[in-house]
Design a protein with these regions (language model features):
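Flexible, glycine/charged-enriched surface loops at secondary-structure junctions
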Residues: 55-57, 170, 258-262
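A short, conserved beta-to-alpha structural element at the edge of catalytic cores
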Residues: 194-214
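Conserved phosphate-handling catalytic cores of large alpha/beta enzymes
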Residues: 206, 212-262, 267
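Short acidic (Asp/Glu) and glycine-rich catalytic loops that position anionic groups and cofactors
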Residues: 21-23, 59-61, 89-94, 203-204, ...
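Glycine/aspartate-rich loop-and-adjacent alpha/beta segment that forms the canonical ThDP
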Residues: 11-25, 254-291
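N-terminal amphipathic, basic-rich helices that act as targeting or association modules
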Residues: 2-5, 9-97, 105
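Flexible loop/turn segments at secondary-structure boundaries
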Residues: 100-102, 179-180, 207-210, 242-243, ...
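Cofactor-binding active-site loop characterized by glycine-rich and histidine/acidic residues
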Residues: 57, 62-194, 212-218, 223, ...
């Protein structure tokens, strides 16, 4: 009886604050309402993503996975939050740290590990590897291996949506390191000029490879970097699944009416940049433990 009653509850959660540029913070969501089933769903999926990454780590270290491998453990709330706010009709395009996004867009764990192990049962028949998952049926346009190369393609997806009068947005994710890539700002300028329904989503995990944001960017307030293209910016806690969900829901409506938004999702990766990164020369273990 108690178990049945507990499943009926709903709760309102206060969301963490935002940092904004050229957009009124007062119009942003301040709370989220959730229930037992959604909480269970969130925890289940985030734990599955974490488990996929940890198992992949072990398989790589045992020599069964070869080539490149970029893990996203620590960033599970970001992938899950996006999936709660977007539909399969909203194209999502990302970069090489793509396992969590792929899983949330319908690529099964069986397909993920088949691909990582180079088997024909993999998502790309074992030919793409870690950085090139995709799922055309669910609007997941893949991971890309070169920093920033997915962004102009994402702008093209946004253009196609507007051209075809679709009521959807293109979600373009990239890391803090890509914020210093020229093609990002070329794509942003075009999206702003034509008022395309694009969300520029920065997965700021604080490090581009082994270089801290403060050592790589003159302006470390990444949510302000769309200003030159006249794109409003917002920073949110990317470790809070409901903060991500509610902001992206708001952003989708905003982009459909007014054009692109520039969003910095503050997150953190527990592993190094890739499996070749010993992760001991540029940050202390205490930093990871504190997070």
């Amino acid at each position: 009886m108690l178990a049945r009653i507990s499943r009926r509850f709903s709760v309102k959660l206060s969301l963490p604050g935002y940092k904004t540029k050229n957009i009124d913070e007062n119009i942003l969501p301040k709370e989220a309402e959730t229930n037992f089933e959604e909480l269970k769903d969130c925890l289940t999926d985030m734990m599955k993503i974490r488990r996929i990454e940890i198992v992949a780590d072990n398989l790589y270290k045992s020599g069964k996975i070869r080539g490149f491998l970029h893990l996203s453990d620590g960033q599970e709330a970001l992938a899950k939050g996006l999936s709660l706010a977007l539909t399969d009709e909203d194209p999502l395009i990302t970069f090489y740290r793509d396992h969590g996004h792929a899983y949330m867009r319908g690529v099964s764990a069986h397909e993920i590990f088949g691909e990582l192990l180079g088997k024909s049962t993999g998502n790309a028949k074992g030919k793409g590897g870690s950085m090139h998952f995709y799922n055309e049926e669910t609007g997941f346009y893949g991971g890309y291996g070169i920093v920033g190369e997915n962004i102009p393609i994402g702008a093209g997806l946004a253009f196609a949506l507007k051209y075809k009068h679709k009521n959807n947005v293109a979600a373009i994710t990239f890391g803090d390191g890509a914020c210093n890539q020229g093609q990002l700002y070329e794509a942003a300028n075009m999206c702003s000029l034509w008022k395309l329904p694009a969300l520029f989503l920065i997965e700021n995990n604080c490090y581009g490879m082994g270089t801290s944001v403060v050592r790589a960017s003159a302006n470390t307030q990444l949510y302000t970097r769309g200003d030159n293209a006249d794109i409003p910016g917002i920073r949110v806690d990317g470790q809070d699944v409901f903060a991500v969900k509610e902001l992206i829901k708001f952003s989708k409506d905003y982009a459909l009416e007014k054009g692109p938004l520039w969003i910095e999702l503050r997150t953190y990766r527990y592993h190094g940049h890739s499996m070749s990164d010993p992760d001991i020369s540029y940050r202390e273990k205490e930093e990871i433990q504190e997070i």
